[in-house]
Amino acid sequence: MFEQTFKNIDDILHKDAGCGSELDYVEQTSWVLFLKYLDDLENDKQTAAELTGKTYTNIIAPEYQWAVWAAPKLNNGKIDHNAFTGDDLLDFVNQKLFPYLKKFKTSAESANTIEYKVGEIFSELKNRIQSGYNLREVVNLID
């Protein structure tokens, strides 16, 4: 299952003008996977806090959370087909999401925080996927 998904992602990235090698495929797949993992982690922490009567504050602002920009769902749980795609998705990722995540490095309380680590990761990354339609396909496969 996972092997076929990664092969499908590689096939999509192979078609993209911004990804010229297997190293690009790995790097681009990694940042998308990381954001999905981070969203799942925050959801788990939120659930655990609710079960113990505590509150949890997400480190990612609502408008930058996976469920908002990457995989918005309708009330019935199905994918919202009005989600960002094409140039809208690329503009959001390149001009809003990445700059937002890079700022975590300077705004974190210390280097030992997850915020700092997120900022460090995204200060070294660049979205190389040039087609917002290819990026949408990759995001959908990872979701």
Tell what function each PLM region has.
Residues 1-143:
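Non-catalytic, mostly N-terminal accessory regions of nucleic-acid modification and defense proteins
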